Regions:
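Catalytic or ion-translocation cores adjacent to nucleophile or general acid/base/metal-coordination motifs
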Residues: 414-456
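N-terminal beta-propeller domains
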Residues: 1-102, 139-178, 232, 318-396, ...
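Small/polar beta-strand repeat architecture
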Residues: 5-22, 97, 101-119, 155-175, ...
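Beta-rich, blade/repeat-based domains predominating
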Residues: 66-67, 120, 392-393, 438-441
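Elongated alpha-helical scaffolds
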Residues: 79, 83, 109-138, 347, ...
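Surface-exposed extracellular loop regions of Gram-negative outer-membrane beta-barrel proteins
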Residues: 402-419
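Loop/turn segments within WD40 beta-propeller blades
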Residues: 74-75, 124, 395-398, 442-445
Length: 473
């Protein structure tokens, strides 16, 4: 019997699974194929050969896995990064970037062959932020066509864990420079090197561990430019005022007044204990501040000051006392972010092993400042509240921030339709429950293409006006 081969003009169904073999009753059966290899399916049905490739250069180590990453400054300045075992190389305009001796421009990195596939990244202009759970966040910077550098991200004021709720206290032995931080109970481990500590009224970064109760740390710069754990104010504009000048014996508050009006600017706050030296009549230690304005600092009752006019060169400092109010940094050895994105002028980290469902948003327009607060441009932290603890796998910035976790897909947005994201209006809504694999997705148009948790399906997450939510059919 003669064999007949039917002509096929339409392949819009793509490759068919073996489960559909013989299903001639399905309309899409006639539009599919067993294998479509080295061809592109056209929207109108036909096939065309895929574009060819061109040999540019051999990777540094052909026997090891190597990854290619796009680095795009704009549509005219597009680079390809070759990332391999502890190195990066760069390509542009069909050629490898070399130095004056025709040697490939190369950066040394800490990402091993096994870690390269898990590196995630987000770019803004000439800077690309890279994250991997085994390494602190880093940034790749292009200074010129042949000048590239990679450095650790210097996070001076966050992100931080929740405040301490134990009875353990911390005490620093200095206000500036390198200080010893002593804990009242075992607290520090070798994994804390490089970790931030918020204590007293400042931040310090741990540089070494002396014991389980003592860490050496470098004091960090504050937002107002001061680099200290407690304020230090040297001036000759402070006068002293008796709260009970008639000696009635009634309970009263004595006060300091500053004609320069610098108490708040210098960092003095209610609840702080202060020490003063250099005064003719009023040197004191560890007095409690109960009220403060730019020009007035009021101390707690029971502390008597003698009336004294301004003129002495005095130094007022915040006292260093053992304090239960402290916080440890959220990023440390064994718990670094595993995904990163930019959203509404904020750098966002997520997916640490210690807080797998928490996102850390930088301050608006200040990408490396994660200090939280309630002002509209302050940093914020948000933890997904759900029945299961599913690690955040990826972040994708679109009109809303798409968050893929191992158990489902979410979006982060402001509560108001046209409002920017702030610490007081953030909300997160679950959209689907497919779960995502730890593979960086692609944003194409308004759709996010991601790999499902089992790595067997490619799904398209897109907004549906019918359901007023995202769907991934």
């Amino acid at each position: 019997m003669a064999k007949v081969s039917a002509a096929k003009q339409n392949f819009t169904a793509g490759e068919l699974t073996q489960r559909l073999f013989g299903r001639t009753d399905l309309g899409r059966y006639d539009n599919g194929a067993t294998t479509v290899e080295n061809f592109l399916v056209q929207p109108h049905g036909g096939l065309s050969r895929r574009p060819g490739t061109r040999y540019i250069a051999e990777v540094k180590t052909s026997s090891a896995k190597t990854r290619l990453i796009r680095f795009q400054f704009n549509v005219e300045q597009v680079y390809v990064i070759e990332m391999g075992n502890n190195y990066m190389r760069f390509y542009k305009d069909g050629g490898q970037i070399v130095d004056g001796s025709s040697n490939a421009i190369e950066l040394t990195t800490t990402y091993t062959t096994a870690q390269v596939p898990d590196v995630k990244f987000a770019q803004t202009a000439d800077v690309m932020y890279l994250v991997h759970p085994a390494h602190p966040p880093r940034k790749l910077t292009r200074s010129s066509h042949t000048s590239w550098s990679i450095t650790d991200v210097d996070l001076k004021r966050g992100a931080m864990l929740d405040p301490n709720i134990t009875t353990t206290t911390l005490l620093a032995n200095g206000r500036t420079g390198n200080v010893n931080i002593t804990a009242s109970a075992s607290l520090f481990t070798s994994n804390d090197v490089g970790r931030l500590v918020q204590l007293h009224k400042g931040f310090a970064k741990i540089t070494s561990i002396t014991s389980a109760t003592v860490a050496v740390a470098a004091v960090q710069e504050l937002e107002d430019g001061r680099t200290e754990l407690m304020p230090t104010y040297a001036t000759n504009t402070i006068s002293f005022h008796e709260g009970d000048p008639d000696n009635t014996g009634l309970e009263h508050n004595d006060r300091l007044e500053d004609t320069a009006g610098n108490f708040i600017d210098q960092g003095f706050e209610v609840g702080m204990r202060v020490t003063l030296t250099g005064s003719t009549s009023n040197n004191f230690s560890n007095l409690l501040v109960v009220a403060v304005t730019d020009t007035t600092l009021v101390i707690a009752p029971g502390n008597d000051l003698a009336a004294e006019a301004a003129g002495d060169s005095v130094t007022l400092v915040g006292s260093l006392v053992a304090d239960k109010k402290w916080r440890l940094g959220a990023f440390f050895i064994g718990s670094y972010p595993s995904t990163v994105a930019f959203y509404e002028q904020r750098l966002v980290f997520a997916g640490t092993s210690n807080q797998p469902q928490t996102m850390f948003f930088s301050q608006s327009g200040d990408f490396e400042n994660f200090e939280i607060g309630t002002d509209a441009d302050d940093g914020l932290q948000y933890t997904i509240g759900s029945n299961e603890v599913n690690v955040i796998r990826y972040l994708v910035s679109s009109s809303q921030l798409v968050v893929g976790t191992s158990g489902g897909e979410f979006v982060v947005r402001a509560s108001g339709f046209d409002e920017p994201l702030t610490p007081t209006n953030t909300q997160i809504k679950q959209q689907t429950t497919f779960g995502s694999a730890p593979i960086q997705p692609l944003l194409i148009g308004n759709s996010t293409l991601f790999i499902q948790r089992a790595k067997r399906k490619l799904r398209e997450l897109a907004f549906s006006s019918e359901s007023d939510s995202y769907v991934a059919p």
